[in-house]
């Protein structure tokens, strides 16, 4: 399975930077990176969403606000999709009646030092993260493994760290 880190690295190193928006919009950019990573639907076809609203609502293992993601996982994992949510009621115009909001833009979080890669009117480029006015929501895709970044393992990791600290303290007591 594709890892979040490999997905992010493909976005950074795949030669997309500078491709004009007219050739690769924000949805198309994410789909292209997934396809270039070899990710396909169970029937063998590439993912073909109906815009960033559809991306936020489908094929996720977790979704929520940036703050909820940081609270739940301790960080935004590399390879997560980040979204711009508008509260203009646009989701109803686009056929959604679930109250989640209108997700008007999507990018791929790639981590420091680049932040986010997304396609805007200036083409595919790096964007600042965090940027509370632009990036409001996060989605972890179901076809990507984020566990390489210790996502979902925070409790186990904390217990392991405490155990290691206790072992080191015990050794220190022996020396003293």
Regions found by a protein language model. Name each.
Residues 1-53, 63, 77, 85-104, ...:
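N-terminal capping segments
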Residues 61-72:
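Short alpha-helix capping/helix-loop boundary micro-motifs
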Residues 77-80, 112-114:
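Loop/turn elements at helix/coil->beta-strand transitions in domains of secreted/extracellular proteins
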Residues 81-83, 108:
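Hydrophobic beta-strand signal
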Residues 90-93, 124-126, 169, 176:
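Short, surface-exposed beta-strand/loop "edge" segments at domain boundaries and coil↔beta transitions
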Residues 104-110:
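A conserved glycine-rich beta-strand in the N-terminal activation segment of trypsin-fold
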Residues 116-160:
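Active-site or metal-binding loop neighborhoods of secreted/extracellular toxin and effector enzymes
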Residues 153-176:
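Short, low-complexity, charged amphipathic interaction modules
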């Amino acid at each position: 399975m594709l890892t979040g880190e490999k997905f992010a690295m493909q976005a950074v190193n795949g030669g997309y930077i500078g491709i004009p928006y007219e050739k690769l919009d924000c949805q198309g950019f994410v789909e292209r990176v997934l396809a270039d990573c070899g990710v396909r639907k169970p029937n063998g076809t590439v993912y073909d969403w109906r815009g960033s609203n559809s991306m936020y609502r489908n094929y996720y293992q977790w979704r929520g606000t940036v703050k909820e993601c940081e609270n739940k996982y301790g960080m935004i994992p590399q390879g997560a999709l980040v979204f711009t949510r508008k509260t203009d009621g646009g989701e109803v115009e686009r056929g959604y009646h679930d109250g989640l909001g209108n997700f008007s833009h999507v990018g791929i979080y790639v981590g420091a030092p680049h932040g986010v890669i997304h396609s805007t009117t200036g083409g595919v480029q790096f964007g600042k993260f965090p940027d509370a006015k632009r990036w409001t929501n996060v989605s972890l895709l179901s076809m990507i493994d984020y566990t390489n970044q210790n996502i979902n393992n925070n409790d186990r990791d904390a217990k392991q760290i405490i155990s290691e600290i206790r072992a080191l303290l015990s050794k220190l007591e022996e020396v003293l």
